[in-house]
Design a protein with these regions (language model features):
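Short, intrinsically disordered, charge-balanced linker/junction segments flanking boundaries
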Residues: 168-173
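Short edge beta-strands and adjacent turn/loop segments
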Residues: 145-154
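Helix N-cap motif at beta-to-alpha junctions
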Residues: 163-167
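N-terminal, positively charged regions that mediate nucleic acid binding
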Residues: 1-90
């Protein structure tokens, strides 16, 4: 079973949903040109919110826009949606000032049901983690506003999105254990 992003609800669904994401959409004006996908083994993948990354499709998996994929992360793997393939990816990488000399992580596979299960479990605990993180920040008198939490697709790592007027010394904050 293949999955893709269902943008009516913002969730993921089986491939074949007809709704399109207009937000942060990269229009692939070369999509209908034969051989476009073979020109580059790089793909652009979007994660929660506006976070995007570039990955090498070294296994030559047939990918198209909207496919949900498992990609390499440190540690483990993450789940994201393919937003661009083919010749335009290197141009987007250049536009985003992506350092091509750095080691580029790779696409592992199209997401499997077990990947989606772990992803949904991780996504389900994001709100509770955000609330707990806000409580901890308040208890530590950290002048910051935590706006969102994003767990990696396998649940091994979390990204905390916050705003602050000044630099936040978060060393004591990072050593605390949040709910899992």
């Amino acid at each position: 079973m293949e999955y893709k992003l269902h943008n009516g609800s913002g969730g993921l669904c089986c491939k074949g949903c007809s709704r399109q994401d207009k937000k942060l959409n990269t229009y692939d004006w070369l999509a209908d040109i034969p051989g476009n996908a073979e020109e580059s083994d790089m793909v652009e993948v979007q994660f929660k919110n506006t976070r995007k990354g570039y990955f090498r499709n070294s296994n030559k998996i047939k990918l198209e826009k909207g496919d949900v994929v498992a990609v390499e992360a440190a540690p483990g793997h993450d789940i994201g949606v393919v937003t661009l393939t083919g010749r335009l990816v290197p141009l987007q990488m250049k536009k985003a000032n992506f350092k091509a000399d750095a080691e580029i992580k790779r696409v592992y596979r199209k997401a499997k049901p077990v990947d989606m299960e772990k992803f949904n479990e991780a996504k389900a605990k994001e709100h509770a983690t955000m609330i707990r993180a806000r409580q901890i920040a308040l208890n530590l008198n950290l002048d910051m506003k935590i706006g969102d939490v994003e767990y990696q697709g396998d649940g091994n790592k979390a990204i905390f999105y916050y705003i602050a007027d000044e630099r936040v010394d978060s060393v004591s904050y990072t050593h605390l254990t949040l709910p899992t």
